[in-house]
């Protein structure tokens, strides 16, 4: 079964016109509940982690009160009201953990900037507590894992409160050719917080929604190709996709050890940087060989690189070929971003194309690597779980067939079946892995940076949110995540503007372990633009025939039910 990139794009289509039938509430049947003031003299909504810490240091706020405030918002906005459906579980131990952290603070023992800060984790990140880890699938419903994922353990050690687990695209969007971003058999369909009939992207859907809707101070997602940065773009927040190996993947339901990485979602670059420092593995993790090298390039404090004037004197390249031209509206946000970057004192080189982008967009190497690694990596992970219904990919396939009314009611499991069939030899895999590393890294992003002595590349992260449509699938035109994904390089999405009331983000791309430079640039862009707009949970976004998109060749077509091609985000 040969699949080229264009087919890969087409097969990545899914979403939700039939949300009620998916087991979630119908669109906004009553007004959004009024948020009662939980903290006298302080507005929790949009508060930064630094502001929350200052309030706790001054005695105006406690970890217990902050946790209760977010729990109240979850009940009002996620379970009721707009029913965002972004959270699968709230940690029953969150309150007691918060009380313990408040006692530490009163004793003068503050662990750091995350002390007492509630954080949500994507449901594919193991926690050894009273919460399950299921990757959104009923096939993993059962006892909690025996051990925390390393990122969860690191966050706990930093003083963060694991508030709960977020809904996600089931199995991180690597089950079906036709899955809907933000849908899982366990949780149903997530909703975009800006317009509830729009898709939140995925696979870290709930993490993006919850941070945008102020249900948490920040959240943690995972990415193989686009799953942190796409929900960040579409949900109007910051997302950092770190270099592979900066954060440990131990205890995370895998797709690909060559591309998987764990990173933060937050409303500001500063908050995302704070979370990244708490998550990062400064020492090698024996459970993840990718953390063995480059520890001198990993920091416990990434906020030191924040700089509101970070664009001044920088050289920024605009990657256009293969990652722009999908819609007038998205391109308009890009042009505005370029203008802001220039006004902030940067030199812009336009275009600064990735020379290997055509081969990257064909996707043959990436597909080979992901399909080959998925079966092996997933089976190895499942061997660590006990008391759940499945122990292998083959058993997951059989489970879904036995529970097709709940798991296969909207789409199938073609990626599962394809991976289980072992279509690629070890030689095929080794060749593809070496080639994707080359075209993504040295001959791709690195070559583009070196050609014009650039500090970073920018590109639109993706187009605005499409209508959720479980029957026909995701409708997005394209994205810029793949070069960094296959190289294992970092990307930061920052809100850049709005199109039809929907957020559009810009990605800053750099070389391996280039997070310090990207954080400096991203914080400068954020300070120059202040583009984030708080969501208002509007029921639907009606569009008329004036909305148009451009195909790759520049011709224009009228947009009806959505773009004909969709780049999968996994």
Question: What is the meaning of each model-derived region?
Answer:
Residues 1-97, 106, 320, 336-346, ...:
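An N-terminal boundary/leader segment
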Residues 32-225, 243, 267-270, 441, ...:
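Gly/Ser-rich catalytic/binding loops embedded in alpha/beta enzyme cores
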Residues 67-68, 149, 301, 328-353, ...:
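Acyltransferase
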Residues 76, 161, 212-320, 324, ...:
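Structural helix-boundary/capping segments
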Residues 116-135, 304-319, 368-443, 495-503:
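Short helix-loop capping/hinge segments that flank enzyme active sites or metal/cofactor-binding pockets
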Residues 134-137, 191, 203, 253-261, ...:
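Flexible glycine/proline-enriched surface loops and loop-helix/loop-strand junctions
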Residues 452, 464-482:
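Short, surface-exposed loop/helix-turn segments at secondary-structure junctions
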């Amino acid at each position: 079964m040969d699949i080229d990139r264009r087919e890969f794009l087409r097969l990545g289509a899914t979403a939700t016109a039939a949300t009620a039938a998916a087991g979630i509430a119908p669109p906004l049947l009553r007004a959004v509940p009024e948020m009662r003031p939980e903290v006298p003299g302080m507005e929790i909504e949009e508060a930064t982690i630094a502001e929350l810490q200052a309030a706790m240091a001054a005695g105006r706020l406690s970890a217990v009160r902050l946790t209760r405030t977010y729990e109240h918002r979850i009940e009002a906005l996620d379970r009721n009201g707009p029913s965002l459906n972004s959270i699968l579980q709230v940690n029953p131990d969150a309150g007691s953990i918060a009380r313990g952290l408040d006692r530490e603070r009163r004793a003068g023992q503050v662990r750091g900037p995350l002390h007492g800060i509630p954080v949500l984790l994507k449901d594919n990140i193991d926690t050894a507590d009273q919460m399950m880890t299921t990757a959104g699938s009923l096939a993993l419903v059962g006892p909690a894992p025996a051990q925390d994922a390393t990122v969860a353990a690191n966050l706990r050690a930093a003083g963060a409160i694991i508030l709960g687990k977020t809904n996600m695209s089931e199995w991180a969007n690597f089950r079906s050719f036709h899955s809907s971003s933000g849908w899982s058999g366990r949780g149903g369909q997530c909703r975009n917080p800006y317009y509830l009939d729009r898709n939140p992207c995925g696979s870290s859907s709930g993490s993006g929604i919850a941070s945008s809707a102020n249900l948490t101070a920040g959240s943690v997602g995972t990415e193989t190709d686009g799953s942190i940065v796409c929900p960040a773009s579409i949900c109007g927040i910051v997302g950092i996709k770190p270099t592979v190996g900066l954060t440990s993947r131990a205890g995370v339901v895998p797709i690909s050890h060559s591309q998987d990485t764990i990173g933060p979602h937050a409303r500001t670059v500063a908050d995302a940087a704070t979370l990244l420092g708490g998550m990062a593995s400064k020492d090698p993790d024996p459970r993840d060989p990718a953390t063995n090298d480059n520890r001198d390039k990993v920091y416990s404090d990434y906020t030191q690189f924040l700089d509101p004037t970070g664009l001044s004197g920088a050289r920024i390249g605009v990657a256009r070929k293969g990652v722009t031209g999908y819609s007038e509206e998205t391109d308009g946000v890009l042009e505005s971003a370029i203008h802001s970057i220039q006004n902030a004192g940067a030199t812009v080189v336009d275009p600064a194309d990735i020379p290997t982008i055509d081969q990257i967009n064909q996707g043959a190497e990436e597909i080979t690597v992901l399909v080959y690694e998925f079966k092996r990596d997933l089976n190895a992970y499942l061997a660590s779980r006990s008391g759940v219904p499945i122990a292998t990919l083959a058993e997951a396939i059989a489970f879904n067939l036995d529970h097709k009314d709940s798991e296969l009611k909207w789409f199938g499991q073609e990626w599962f079946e394809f991976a289980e069939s072992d279509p690629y030899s070890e030689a095929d895999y080794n060749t593809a892995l070496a080639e994707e590393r080359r075209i993504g890294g040295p001959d791709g992003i690195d070559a583009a940076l070196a050609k014009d002595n650039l500090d970073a590349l920018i590109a639109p992260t993706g187009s605005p949110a499409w209508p959720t449509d479980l029957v026909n699938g995701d409708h997005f035109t394209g994205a810029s995540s793949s070069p960094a994904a296959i190289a294992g390089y970092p990307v930061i999405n920052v809100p850049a503007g709005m199109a039809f009331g929907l957020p559009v983000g810009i990605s800053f791309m750099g070389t391996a372990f280039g997070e310090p430079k990207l954080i400096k640039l991203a914080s400068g862009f954020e300070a120059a633009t202040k583009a984030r707009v708080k969501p208002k949970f509007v029921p639907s976004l009606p569009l008329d025939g004036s909305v148009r998109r451009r195909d790759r060749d520049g011709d224009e077509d009228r947009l009806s039910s959505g773009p004909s091609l969709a780049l999968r985000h996994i």
